[in-house]
Amino acid sequence: MSKLTPMMQQYQSIKNKYKDAILFFRLGDFYEMFNDDAKIAARELDLALTARNKGGGEKAPMAGVPCHSAESYIAKLLEKGYKVAICEQIEDPSEAKGLVSREVVRIITPGTIIENEMLKDKENNYLASAICYKDHLGFSYVDISTGEFYVTQFSQKFSDKVWDELDRIQPREVIICKELEETENFADKKKQMNFVYNYSRIEKVKAAYNFLLEHFKTNSLSGFGCEDKPAAILAAGEIINFLKDTQKRTLEHINRITTYNLTDYMVLDSATRYNLELTSTIRGNKHKGSLLNVLDQTITSMGGRLIKKWINQPLIDRNKIETRLDAVEELVNNYLLLQEIREHLKGIYDLERILGKVSYGSANARDLAALKYSILKLPQIKKDLEQLNTKLFKNMHETFDPLIDLAGLLDRSIVDEPPVSVREGGLIKDGYSSELDELRKARTEGKDWIANLQKTERERTGISSLKVGFNKVFGYYIEITKANLDRVPDNYTRKQTLSNSERFITPELKEKEALVLGAEEKINDLEYKLFVKIRDIVRDNIKRIKKTAAIISKLDVLTSLAQNALERDYNRPRINNDGVIEIIKGRHPVVEDMGKGAFVPNDTYLDLEEERFIIITGPNMSGKSTYMRQVALIVLMAQMGSFVPADKATIGIVDRIFTRVGASDDLTTGQSTFMVEMNEVANIVNNATRNSLIILDEVGRGTSTYDGLSIAWAVSEYINNPDRIGARTLFATHYHELTQLENRPGIKNYNVLVEEDEDGVHFLHKIIPGKASESYGIEVAQLAGLPMEIIIRAQEILAELEKKGKESTKTGKGENKNISHKTESDLINNIHESDKEYLTKRNTNDKVQQLPLFKSEYRVIEKIKNKDIVNMTPMEAINFLFEIQKELKEKGENYA
């Protein structure tokens, strides 16, 4: 260390305190990184790796980024899971005696981002904690960009509930206890959710309790509802302690903590959120194609974040649901007012994140201008709320603070279009400060004198090319070309010689320069001081502004739901506690939104007694999965307070939705398709209650037919049994044997309507009572484009299996070993002559050809092949072509 240069000694002493972070060390206009940090930065950020003398004749690897563009580089490092410690110069280098003092002012981690450029407008950025305490587990999370802070406690230490909550909020970073890390599935879950984690450091509940009391400046946590929840206190205390260590400041905008219970909301585990595609799609993890994409017509960023919460946490209290629905209905019935409110919301910026920056002391004048524009809209919104009469809107109106005083302050003080920098003036309006006005007047007078100097000096000297200019090095000057140097007055003093001219000053010019530049410096300093005072006043009012912001967010979501109801013909659901779910002409909100044609609606009836377990049979691609998801989404939408895509809907409140939809090998955990499926089924039968809604799309497919059927049968009996679960269930299956369960109380058979005619099989996507007569698997394979050879061979095998099945029924034997084997040539010989040429072509790799689905196309081919085209007259040929075209159009086909 003694061999290091003073600057490198300073660097190393600071780096030793922050070994787990990449240290951005401020040197002038750059952040420099040294040694291993430099190597990491060069690799991850594609920077040039250079070197700097560190003393003792040795060089230290070095890489740097400009301060003005550092955010983009920091964002890339955070995305890759690194922490970044920002080390600033804390004194003016021009005033420093010796080495400039430096210290770390903030540690930026993935879960502690406040910079708008690194955040998505309509998504939260959470830091979470999951801490074990005795037989409980505390769970807490915060978004420091908005100030939202939540906490809860689980009665089971290693419950899957913690993983479901982590999946719901999708945190960027998690603080965990080592006990949780040692659980069997931790590594797999972390990999799936992709979060950075840190270890907890608080051992005593008392210490965590004191951290919270100190932060909230209170004597008790009773007002926050977590006084008697030690595990929750530990989890919340860990977050506050972490923020204290990393952010190096008090965060006034985190001024309350909300204690919640999972039982206050419908439970949606990670599998259900995934299968129902609530906020992102299964394929590609995209926003478009999700329920959120359909429902989110919010105008503000705050509303966008809130509607996502409502989707992920539907209500289970009937009164609360009805309160939301009343509000949405009132907006639906007041179209003009709805549009007026939405127009007013367009002027509202992201108040929550502006307050986060104000709390940090990083808000600039543009942030305060955005706050000003937003607050100036509030009186209009207050008047809008006054015109609404439902309970929720009345409460919102009564508690809505239009912040008139702050609006006046910001409107008087902050210019309409301020610069980004707060140190270079141009922030404060004329008339706000008399002292500032005097300085500006002096500056203006000085500049006017200097501006007139060029004219007066040209007249006085007779030098028409004389110029008055300014640069930062020499200040103001008079420039005269060399051809006119003999005419320079005696009171001019030479300042600088150029190739073609010389620059001079005069005593009067220096005096005015001192006045102007002195005034400029004083103006900039005074404007900054005034700005900081205004920002501090805003900081003192954070609680007030946050309450108003929360009302605006809720209003935005309610207007979004009302707008959706009007545009998409959604209707208000009736909510009950008796368990009846009745949907008339229900539609899938996402499929309908993305589809090109008219969506086929379906009815649904479920109750807790006579029709609680619905077995749905029918072919693949007929709409069974879409129908079941549709029912689940309609229930979820109703309980979040939304109108629903149905002509009528009665929703018996559901405490939890379970889905077991499809399955594939889980490569991250090494589990087979069948194991994944059985884990999901086990989760359902172990956690479902009588008030749950269960969606089962095939059970038992990943094993042998008899094993699968046996499991599906037993699971059906168990779920349907009121003494076990007795939950409302939709079960789609290809095991037609399960339809025999209809003789059990509570079980009903339904199937998808299929129409057969001379043109083939038509899937009508209509759910009707009764069991399916056939599976139509070969027809679906044909629709998918399998070669004709396979289709025809499958039909022959099916015929033989069905024949042997009938024979086994008579003889009591069920074996089907003697299925005939036929060669390709045998098959082709059995095909109708008119199709041989087509089938031969199908064996090529021509991907453009599509398998004809309907029999009408074969007849068209037959007609064309049998026609004596050579001997046809032109008119006969045209008429024949017209007949062919007409026939194809009537069948709705596009034959190529």
Curated annotation (Swiss-Prot):
CDD domains: ABC_MutS1. The keyword Coiled coil does not apply. Coiled coil: none annotated. ATP binds at G618, P619, N620, M621, S622, G623, K624, S625. Residues 805-825 have a biased composition (Basic and acidic residues). SMART domains: MUTSac, MUTSd. Residues 805-826 are annotated as: Disordered. GO terms for cellular component: cytosol. Keywords: ATP-binding, DNA damage, DNA repair, DNA-binding, Nucleotide-binding. One of its GO terms (biological process) is mismatch repair. GO terms for molecular function: ATP binding; ATP-dependent DNA damage sensor activity; damaged DNA binding; mismatched DNA binding. This protein is involved in the repair of mismatches in DNA. It is possible that it carries out the mismatch recognition step. This protein has a weak ATPase activity. Belongs to the DNA mismatch repair MutS family. This is DNA mismatch repair protein MutS. It comes from Halothermothrix orenii (strain H 168 / OCM 544 / DSM 9562).
